[in-house]
From Swiss-Prot:
The keyword Iron-sulfur applies. It is found in: Cytoplasm. It catalyses: N(6)-dimethylallyladenosine(37) in tRNA + (sulfur carrier)-SH + AH2 + 2 S-adenosyl-L-methionine = 2-methylsulfanyl-N(6)-dimethylallyladenosine(37) in tRNA + (sulfur carrier)-H + 5'-deoxyadenosine + L-methionine + A + S-adenosyl-L-homocysteine + 2 H(+). This is tRNA-2-methylthio-N(6)-dimethylallyladenosine synthase. InterPro entries: Elp3/MiaA/NifB-like_rSAM, Methylthiotransferase, Methylthiotransferase_CS, Methylthiotransferase_N, Methylthiotransferase_N_sf, MiaB_methiolase, rSAM, rSAM_horseshoe. Monomer. Catalyzes the methylthiolation of N6-(dimethylallyl)adenosine (i(6)A), leading to the formation of 2-methylthio-N6-(dimethylallyl)adenosine (ms(2)i(6)A) at position 37 in tRNAs that read codons beginning with uridine. The lineage of its organism: Bacteria, Bacillati, Actinomycetota, Actinomycetes, Micrococcales. Pfam families: Radical_SAM, UPF0004. [4Fe-4S] cluster 2 binds at residues 176, 180, 183.
Length: 535
């Protein structure tokens, strides 16, 4: 992995060196959405630019928790982690704990009241201040709190340590201008701020120059991009411009808002070959009455119409969604409307949430809060329906050849099986068998496989005779370089798999050979942690 240094310079910090003269180590723990994942890359980049080094599995001198504030269990996760870290800190001389992100922006001093052993609290608008705050807290031997109410510097100007050598996130905007009654994000991340197209494309080009072949464009509402500079077609133009970057094979984006999803975006998706046939489109509810109560400025008929137009121009596109069950005032009739829309939409996957009261949102004080047992029963019915649909949609792919970008960190790992994993063009997760005598693909290489089995959350491609078809890529070369730089054992790229069934130790995910296909697995498009994330 590499640090891509953008415009901002993070000075070296004296606090990054311990009393023994060694560089102090850090660990970043991330809760929540894909925005937080990308923010954590910036936090890591800023810390390393200041002189800190990764803990790499050891007990870290600095623990940074990047928080989410969307659901109640996000609070529970934070304070559970902090409770555990209290005892660790007592025996670890000089250890520092920092809490940032949305929950820090919301709770501010409350975090220190509940966990006085925390050293630094910072918000969503000043991530670049972390090294300075750690140094000040260490020097003064007192906690530092710095929460800004508005964005001063666009975070993409910060040094960034990418989690992947072959795929990267690129923020096109931060904040949100919508006023959904269940969502606290606009209050914590502010109004929408758009980056200029030239800055975005320069960052994409820099990623490609580093070896990346896949980029995901990020925003709370990507298709409202351009609102700040008055161009309603700015997002479709951005997709087309990114599509012209040589060497960029896959472009994804998340998340759009149905109310602002226009025909020019659909045309750009269909006419730009490296924009992937995948769409994550949050539904939230299939009831028009509930959508009004949520302040979602579309109705179910419009939503389904968008899906029809997307599929007309991108046949076979995989569409995923978010759905909230048990929103205040939801009746059985409202819920049946949601089931009806889900059946009609034929989502490849859905991230489903039981409504969680978030103080500070209009929905928190609405009448008609649905009893927990009713929410659970409806939630179970929705899950059962979507599992059936996901399986039926995946079964349609059996016998088809799919092109995979070989990945790391996908699915379960088991050193005794020969299955590796990758993402199809439509982002479906595919676990594939490595035939005897085949070239071993590296993360970032492309493999062509034939689907042999289907489950609701993934596909299986067992060997069908003959060697695996692999296309070596610049991204695979970049992965090799990153492995060499980290002093890891050289990969088996270019070699041959042993003829006998044995172990493949590549740091790649695998599945148990005899695992039942009906068992729960990784979501088809895991853009965030569905237990505490948001779109």
């Amino acid at each position: 992995m590499s640090i891509i240094d953008h415009h901002s310079v993070v000075p070296r910090s004296e606090a990054a060196v311990g009393e023994d003269g060694r560089a102090r180590t850090y660990e970043v723990r991330t809760f929540g959405c894909q925005m937080n994942v990308h923010d954590s890359e910036r936090l890591s980049g800023s810390l390393e630019a200041a002189g800190y080094v990764p803990a790499n599995g050891e007990e870290a001198d600095i623990v940074v928790i990047n928080t989410c504030a969307v659901r109640e269990n996000a609070d529970n996760k934070l304070y559970g982690n902090l409770g555990h870290l209290a005892s660790v800190k007592r025996r670890h001389a000089g250890m520092q704990i920092a809490v940032g992100g949305c929950l820090a922006q919301k709770d501010k001093n409350v975090i220190l009241e509940k966990a006085p052993w925390v050293d630094v609290v910072f918000g969503t608008h000043n991530m670049g201040a972390l090294p300075r705050l750690l140094e000040r807290a260490r020097h003064n031997d007192a906690a530092e709190i710095e929460i800004l109410e508005a964005l001063e510097t666009f975070p993409s100007t910060l040094p960034t340590k990418r989690d992947s050598s072959f795929s990267g996130w690129v923020s096109i905007s931060v904040g949100c201008n919508n006023t959904c009654t269940f969502c606290i994000v606009p209050a914590l991340r502010g109004k929408e701020k758009d980056r200029r197209p030239g800055d975005i494309l320069a960052e994409v080009q820099a990623l490609v120059d580093e070896g990346a072949v896949e980029v995901t464009l990020l925003g709370q509402n990507v298709n409202s991009y351009g609102v700040e500079f008055g161009d309603r077609q700015a997002f479709s133009k951005l997709l087309r411009a990114a599509g012209q970057i040589e060497g960029l094979e896959r472009i994804r984006f998340t998340s759009p808002h149905p109310a602002a999803f226009t025909e020019d975006v659909i045309d750009a998706m269909a006419e730009t070959p490296n924009v992937m046939p995948q769409l994550h489109m949050p539904l939230q509810s299939g009831s028009d009455r509930i959508l009004r109560s949520m302040r979602r400025s579309y109705r179910s008929e419009k939503f389904l119409g968008i899906l029809d137009r997307v599929r007309a121009k991108l046949p076979g596109a995989a569409i995923s969604t978010d759905i909230i069950v048990g929103f205040p005032g939801e009746t059985e009739e409202d819920f049946l409307d949601t089931l009806r829309v889900v059946e009609a939409a034929r989502f490849a996957s859905a991230f489903t949430f039981q409504y969680s009261i978030r103080p500070g949102t209009p929905a928190a004080t609405m009448a008609g809060q649905v009893p927990k047992e009713v929410v659970q029963e409806r939630y179970d019915r929705l899950i059962a329906l979507q599992e059936r649909i996901s399986l039926e949609e995946n079964e349609k792919l059996i016998g088809r050849d799919v092109e995979l970008l070989v990945a790391t960190g996908e699915g379960r790992k088991d050193a005794d099986t020969r299955r590796l994993s990758g993402r199809a063009r439509d982002s479906r997760l595919v676990h594939f068998e490595l035939p005897a005598g085949s070239e071993v693909p590296r993360p970032g290489d492309v493999a062509l496989v034939r689907v042999t089995q289907a489950a609701p959350h993934y596909l299986i491609a067992d060997a069908a005779g003959g060697p695996l078809r692999v296309r070596r890529t610049r991204a695979g070369d970049a992965w090799d370089r990153a492995e060499a730089e980290s002093c890891a054992a050289p990969s088996l790229s270019g070699g041959r798999a042993a003829a006998a069934v044995g172990r493949v130790s590549l740091g790649l995910p695998t599945l148990r050979t005899r695992e039942p296909l009906t068992s729960p697995g990784v979501g088809t498009m895991p853009l965030y942690d569905p237990t505490d994330g948001q779109r």
